[in-house]
Amino acid sequence: GFRAFLRWEMEREYTEEKRKALFSRGGLYYELKEDYAHALECYTSGGDHSKVSELLVRNAELHPGMGHYAEMEKYYRSLPEAEILASPSLMQGMSMLCALAMDYEGSERWYGELQAFAERCGRQDAAGKQARSRLAWLDISLPQRGVNGLTETIPAVFRLLMNKEVTLPSFSVTSALPSIM
């Protein structure tokens, strides 16, 4: 309808630069209203990968493990790899996304990238602590890991928490529905 007409008119009348600016303003409008799905759509249409990345991280912190991965998958997958590799939160998201799509090889690849990121950071480095926290989260929640190692993993993570070496984001990959956890 009318929306399609407006898009057609925009394509006809606006330069590429003006279109990007319009999508950026639209993204900001939705972001301020905390409508991240529409904001992500606008920022993606405008080609603003850094804003997409920033919003995915913010959304992951607002709704950690509450099933947002499936809803946000196309945005995660649209990001350049370098952007994902710079963020522990995005690497964690990619690892879980791949696992939920039963791409366990991809999931373990992103887990490995996150592990390498954590190893490059110092013990007192905030980014390193965040990466180690996200690794602990993945150790507990990745579905391909099964329940066999959990009897060792959970006490080890508990010790890290008590020593304040990690802080765990909350999680429920089943959208807070009952699960094996």
Where are these regions (language model features)?
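Short, well-ordered secondary-structure microsegments
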Residues: Y36, L40-E83, S87-S95
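TPR-repeat structural position
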Residues: E16, K20, Y36, H49, ...
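Internal alpha-solenoid helical repeat scaffolds
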Residues: A82-M181
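Leucine-rich, amphipathic alpha-helical/linker segments
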Residues: E16-G46
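Structural motif corresponding to the intra-repeat A-B loop/turn of tetratricopeptide repeats
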Residues: K33, G46, M66, A101, ...
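Alpha-helical tetratricopeptide repeat
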Residues: R7, K20-E31, L56-R58, Q92
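Short capping/hinge segments at domain boundaries that bridge a core fold to an adjacent linker or tail
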Residues: G1-G26, H49-S50
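The canonical alpha-helical register within tetratricopeptide repeats
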Residues: R25, S45-G46, R58, E71-S78, ...
